[in-house]
A protein has these predicted regions:
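Positively charged, polar, low-complexity stretches
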Residues: 2-86
Length: 86
């Protein structure tokens, strides 16, 4: 993993709440391998937003800003990457 991805991973997994870590960090782990430069930049921008906003966009309780609409947000909204204890 290159330096940029390591930094994104750290930022994704150290958000401030366990719930945000699981959602945003889990999303990173599930999807980062397929990202090019554009997706990396978009994810880096997304990480500058508050956890409350990101989580609200992901679960659909707030509208997603136009700048984040697209395949990455569609994948985040699926929430199929979060490990749930059984």
């Amino acid at each position: 993993m290159d330096e940029v991805l390591r930094a994104l991973k750290y930022r994704a997994w150290h958000r401030g709440t366990r719930e945000a870590d699981m959602m945003i960090g889990g999303f990173f782990d599930a999807h980062h391998a397929a990202w090019g430069a554009h997706e990396r930049a978009l994810f880096a921008a997304l990480l500058t937003e508050t956890d409350v906003d990101i989580m609200a966009w992901a679960i659909g309780t707030q509208p997603v800003p136009e700048r984040y609409e697209g395949p990455m947000m569609d994948a985040l909204r699926k929430l199929d990457f979060i490990k749930v204890a059984k």
